[in-house]
């Protein structure tokens, strides 16, 4: 029987999560909430659940928040490198669990993102790139991002699109903010 390969599975590598909280301490509250989603962090719990599905594998990527939403471009680029190094390490350590990952970028550092996409794919083995549906409030088709998309086209790998929103973004016109927190799972852009 062929393996089940889930291509949209989020994970917080510990090194990345610790650095994210360090550079964005205002995320401490959401960090506590995210920690309650055990399988984002706890590999034993994740593997136990994966085993319930037989030969089940995950292509891993980062969850919200987008790097560019929490860090200046120079700091964000380093955070993307930490994430990509950590996800590549997980894939090397557990190839039967995590055969591949989608690389993280900091889209507000265009030149850095081009270089990081190439490094993640060519040196670390990323099989694509995860992008959020807006970049710090700007659409993905903003001309500033064209060099990133040109590099991604050259790499000829898939782009994962992650919906993004915040509690401050209303789900309906009559709301002042998201009443039911649908932004956790739906938000285009």
Predicted regions span which residues?
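Helix-coil boundary/capping segments in enzymes
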Residues: 1-189
């Amino acid at each position: 029987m062929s393996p089940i390969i889930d291509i949209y599975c989020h994970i917080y590598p510990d090194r990345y999560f610790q650095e994210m909280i360090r550079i964005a301490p205002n995320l401490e509250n959401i960090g506590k909430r995210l920690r309650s989603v055990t399988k984002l962090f706890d590999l034993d719990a994740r593997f136990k659940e994966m085993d319930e599905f037989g030969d089940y594998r995950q292509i891993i990527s980062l969850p919200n928040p987008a790097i560019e939403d929490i860090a200046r471009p120079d700091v964000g680029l380093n955070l993307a490198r930490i994430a990509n190094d950590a996800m590549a390490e997980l894939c090397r350590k557990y190839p039967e669990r995590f055969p591949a990952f989608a690389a993280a970028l900091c889209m507000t550092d265009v030149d850095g993102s081009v270089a990081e996409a190439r490094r993640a794919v060519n040196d670390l083995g990323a099989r694509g790139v995860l992008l959020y549906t807006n970049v710090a409030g700007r659409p993905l088709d903003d001309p500033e991002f064209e060099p990133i998309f040109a590099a991604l086209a050259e790499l000829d790998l898939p782009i994962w699109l992650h919906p993004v929103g915040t509690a401050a973004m209303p789900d309906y016109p009559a709301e002042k903010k998201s009443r039911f927190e649908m932004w956790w799972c739906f938000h285009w852009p």
